[in-house]
Amino acid sequence: MKKIVLAALILASMFCNAQETNETRKFEPYVNQLGYNLNESKRFVCYGAEDGTSFKITNTATSKIVFEGEILNNEGWFSDFNPDGIADEFIITADGHGSSVPFLIADHLLETTSSKLAYDFFVDARGFSDLSTYDMAAVYGGGPTRDGGAYGLETIFEILQYASNPALFDNWKSELGDKKVADLIELILWHAEFAYKYVDYNGPVKKRHGTLGYQGQPRMTYDYWNTLDQLAAVCAAYHSFLKPYLDEETYQKYRKACLDNWEAYDRHKVVRFWTYSTKWVDQGFQEFNEMGNAYGQSVFRNLLMYECERHEKDGSPEKFLKWAQAGASDIIKNWDFENPRHMWWIRNAEHITPQALSFFLLLAPEKAPKETKEKLEAWALHMKQKTNNFWKYRTHSESEWAHPKTKELGGAPALGGSMFAVAHLLNDPELRALGWAQTDFVFGVNPVGTHLSNKSDDRVKIGGYWPGVEKGWPQSHPNGFGELGKVRGTLDGSPLDSQFPIAETVETIEGKNEGRVFGKNAYATEGWGISNRGWQATLTFSTLGSHSLKVLDSESTTEISEVKPGQTVNILLKAALNVDRNTKDKGWVLLKTGEQTENIALTETGINTGIFTAKFKIPKNTDVNILELSYGFLGFEQSLTLNVQH
């Protein structure tokens, strides 16, 4: 029965042919083709549906209608629909508009399905694997990530991704073919060694799209500065989770490289007018840009060095904190939401600004400038105003949805992460819902009605595509500078201004890009490492607000904060660890007793519950007064203390 229903759905939701127009075509409901997280915002778009049009949600396994509602302003909402038990597939049918493709609703569906693909991209997209033989003169064809230099900041966001949900990544250690990097920790260490090996490299390389440097000063040919930014993240992570994998001698080499070059490479301050671009989309001097000089990057790097240095006996944390505070104050004073060169114009790097301010409040809230939260509140209000449309898409202006030629991919895929981070800090459920709308946009709730990644046979064969997503981006550019055709998890395209409010026709072009077509048809912008970095950030910050840690009494009836020696308690963690919805998954938390830290294993309470527990007996002979439990690192911690009553 299910196969029949699915076949009917596929036929009902096929792309329209070239002869159809907006006047004749009835657009089907566009849903998040992967599905929706339990207990989070859920919505779809049915373009052209009149207000009041009824819609129904049907369970494809039982053929039963499980939810009903009405469409308003082309949107249908079903946030209150949170089915229990094993995840089933559903479809949405709107009167007169046919049916959607099937989708799931499950615990932490986005994170558990997408997080591995997010770092798999950086495993596959490396320009080389052997650091001893690589020729840096070809950096634009290789580098740590192909089609990019050291400015990609991959290591920073790989480290934040691990810190946000570490037990999830510890379960993924399989390799692909002859790739030498298997898991996220190994990938981080590979990028760290790259950054150290080429910390002072400064060209020459192939010249593309302009030159780098301060306005009025000699031009640089390679972004060597940002190797230090990546090493700073490694040095910070050493003290939280990298010690078992990184020997102290190597760590101290990385730290010394940062300390010796930090001010010489202008890492201590905000850098403006740093590149002169000849690219048609952003010609001229750029105050900030996507190539390693994002507004807010100074906050990230100096906070990470502060975190490193505060653990060292001979450290100098205060100067890095001062520089981080100066960078944050600069953002608070000068970040202009109406200046496109501070916002969408810098495309793939735009997400760094709000995320850097948010990171300050996560990592060291008492040290952040006092106006930090107020600036983020202003940004949140601006975003709500700019997304006041049925796509929930952040528009460019009153007359333009998106760029007429290219938006690259730094908009919706990365914007969700910024919204998640700020919504968590402001306790703003409306902004969090907008963050989920951005992820829906990535998975098909957009004018083209497809995922932003091309579903090629090559990617499917290597496990490089999202399971259950039927319609991928219709065009790919597999053999560009990034050579991303066989790279897992690549994002390939994003709607142009001409595709809004709806794409009239969508032409599928397999395996090639016949130039960049700026008309009505969708086109592939060509994936890029920096684009996927923003998507990685969204998956990182989405965990804020959905993870929780509690300790209950032995009967699991009451939450407690005081315990006695010899008492048995239940530790309860809710986190994005429910990878296999047919078995009980595993997790862990850290228990700190005085100077000792141990790992406590957790098991899911049942199949597909997403809640992980363990019974723990307080040692009878303990003489400490406080036990500390935590999950996560670097500001992403869920933590609590237990007072031991002797």
PLM ranges: what are they?
Residues 9-17:
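Hydrophobic h-region of N-terminal signal peptides that target proteins for export
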Residues 21-27, 39, 100-131, 646:
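Low-complexity, Pro/Ser/Thr- and charge-rich linker/hinge segments at domain boundaries
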Residues 23-34, 546-564:
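Short, compositionally biased P/S/T/A/G/V-rich stretches that sit at domain boundaries
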Residues 33-97, 127-153, 160-161, 214-244, ...:
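Aromatic (Trp/Tyr) and acidic
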Residues 37, 50, 560-563, 577-585:
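A short beta-turn/strand-edge loop motif at beta-sheet boundaries
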Residues 43-48, 569-577:
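Aromatic/hydrophobic beta-strand junction motif of beta-rich domains
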Residues 72-81, 604-623:
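Aromatic sugar-binding surface patches on proteins
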Residues 112-329, 333-343:
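Extended ligand-binding groove/face enriched in aromatic
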